[in-house]
Amino acid sequence: MPLLDSFKVDHTKMNAPAVRIAKTMRTPKGDNITVFDLRFCIPNKEILSPKGIHTLEHLFAGFMRDHLNGDSIEIIDISPMGCRTGFYMSLIGTPNEQEVSEAWLASMQDVLGVQDQASIPELNIYQCGSYTEHSLEDAHEIAKNVIARGIGVNKNEDLSLDNSLLK
């Protein structure tokens, strides 16, 4: 089984909240695709609650599109990490970390503006596979934490995992 790029970085050196360009690629038609690691929590020290990350998934995807999509950028997908320390965002285009950071902060402000559970998009039995597993309160706490701490940048060259540690 090939070793995925996300496991070639040293998680003990990651800062959070922080943006990292996890991968870039070019399609055969010439489109640039960028995958971002949006790290909300310090790996192995902090974790997002299951209900909080789920609610954030419903809110964050739309808010990030509102703030980042444009003529040269289109978000393909934003998905929570299985380790519950952040999200991966795949998009067409090549925004820099600062642009992504600004959109992320604005999105966290938008999350705080959601006043009740009924305002969470797609929160129903038909559009959500676990529609009872949500917490707007937890999502608000996550957003407040990101805003209070600010968003940094994790660079791949600073996180390169020594080959002796690869398994």
Swiss-Prot record:
A Pfam family this chain is assigned to: LuxS
Enzyme Commission number(s) of this protein: 4.4.1.21
Requisite cofactors: Fe cation
Record-stated family: Belongs to the LuxS family.
Listed PANTHER family: S-RIBOSYLHOMOCYSTEINE LYASE
Subunit structure: Homodimer.
Name by which UniProt lists this protein: S-ribosylhomocysteine lyase
